[in-house]
Amino acid sequence: MTQHSRDTPQFYLTAPSPCPYLPGRHERKVFTHLVGNKAGELNDLLTHGGFRRSQSIAYRPACDQCRACVSVRVIANEFKPSRNQRKLLARNADIVGEQRNPVPTSEQYSVFRAYLDQRHRYGGMADMTVLDYAMMVEDSHVQTRMIEYRKRTPDTGITGRGGELIAAALTDVLGDGLSMVYSFYEPNEQHRSLGTFMILDHIARARRLGLPYVYLGYWIEGSKKMDYKGRYLPQQRLAPSGWLRIDASGEMQPEPQD
């Protein structure tokens, strides 16, 4: 009995709370703990089923009478950037991405704090302290990386190191893709569209690693905060019948792909 309870994940349901994305609605989540030697394997399995990771917790929406949150993953090797996205990549050609272990730094927190203060001042993460940030980065029992984005310097070509930190993405490496857990950027660099740039960079990284997907989290039709995730096509969206393909034309394939 003890062995069974240790190896079998236990799931819990949160109490209803106001939905941060759709006004007038309430959200509930089902969650479990990601701990132990099989945390990575469980995280892969749950991500395929529409869960997201936050520290050592895997969760997914379980709202009463609402299924607006739809898990999306970009098909990396088929993705072709649009004309505007190609311009954006060219605009940010002076940025170098550096993959690191998930170790929090004061430099990261400074950018993170500026991002929250300007972009999400009244959000649920607005009061996060430096210790809260450290927990967000370090509390992972799966294969996690921190991708730092820095401006190139005259020495970058020699050292491989960039200069000023302007963005970062906490990213899980799954068996079939990259999952963007949380990303943030310097708000004074708004002209760079760094949020879009980081997604495009992750698609390129997944392709180089031979990984088929980039998991973006939840797309919510009608939510301005989440609508952008539908722009990266082709992609797959999780339906009750399985993952459904959305072509570059925006048309949905009727058959699940998995």
Curated annotation (Swiss-Prot):
Subcellular locations according to the entry: Cytoplasm
Keywords from the UniProt entry: Acyltransferase, Cytoplasm, Transferase
Pfam families registered for this protein in UniProt: ATE_C, ATE_N
Reactions accelerated catalytically: N-terminal L-glutamyl-[protein] + L-leucyl-tRNA(Leu) = N-terminal L-leucyl-L-glutamyl-[protein] + tRNA(Leu) + H(+); N-terminal L-aspartyl-[protein] + L-leucyl-tRNA(Leu) = N-terminal L-leucyl-L-aspartyl-[protein] + tRNA(Leu) + H(+)
InterPro entries: Acyl_CoA_acyltransferase (IPR016181), Asp_Glu_LeuTrfase (IPR017138), N-end_Aminoacyl_Trfase (IPR030700), N-end_Aminoacyl_Trfase_C (IPR007472), N-end_Aminoacyl_Trfase_N (IPR007471)
A single GO BP: ubiquitin-dependent protein catabolic process via the N-end rule pathway
Entry GO MF terms: arginyl-tRNA--protein transferase activity; leucyl-tRNA--protein transferase activity
Group of enzyme by EC: transferase
Assigned EC number: 2.3.2.29
One Gene Ontology CC term in the entry: cytoplasm
Record bears the keyword Transferase: yes
Entry similarity comment: Belongs to the R-transferase family. Bpt subfamily.
Role: Functions in the N-end rule pathway of protein degradation where it conjugates Leu from its aminoacyl-tRNA to the N-termini of proteins containing an N-terminal aspartate or glutamate.
Matching HAMAP family: Bpt (MF_00689)
Name of this chain's protein: Aspartate/glutamate leucyltransferase
Species in which this protein is naturally found: Rhodopseudomonas palustris (strain ATCC BAA-98 / CGA009)
Gene encoding the protein: bpt
